[in-house]
Amino acid sequence: MSTKKERLDAICGIIQTKVISNQEELLKELEDSGFSVTQATLSRDIKQLKVAKVHDGNGDYVYRLPEESISKQAQPEGKKKPNIEFSGNLAVVKTRPGYAMGIASDIDSHAPSEILATIAGDDTILVIPRNGVSQEKVIAALSHFI
């Protein structure tokens, strides 16, 4: 019997090394690696890992891990710079293609007190702060998600 951490590590490894375009393919790869997983469990794991389906440039969509999961150890904590720009009190966050909706959903579900709402496209998030919240506080609130 494998632990959840082992299964999550296996999912990350498979997504990083193989072209996976749906849960069925990922389930098969996990089974080939010795993991017995239901589709419901896999779906929860994918959500927990914040796996996104992104366009691969060939007309297909494939699973990708968020950039922070892949390069978290490679980038020292002090060197992280989110790509956030402001227009008045509105913040615009640029992400990798396909990641904006997942990140915006994460922000909305955690509901930081500084953020009123988000609107997401494919690679851009419009962040609407609450009245009177400074840009510095918005950046601090968003830094937990990007």
From Swiss-Prot:
Subcellular location: Cytoplasm
Pathway(s) of this molecule: Amino-acid biosynthesis; L-arginine biosynthesis [regulation]
Main localization, broad class: cytoplasm
GO CC aspect terms: cytoplasm
Superkingdom of source: Bacteria
GO terms (BP aspect): L-arginine biosynthetic process; protein complex oligomerization; regulation of arginine biosynthetic process
Pfam short name (any one): Arg_repressor
Keywords attached to this entry: Amino-acid biosynthesis, Arginine biosynthesis, Cytoplasm, DNA-binding, Repressor, Transcription, Transcription regulation
GO molecular function: arginine binding; DNA binding; DNA-binding transcription factor activity
Role according to the record: Regulates arginine biosynthesis genes.
Entry similarity comment: Belongs to the ArgR family.
Protein name, entry field: Arginine repressor
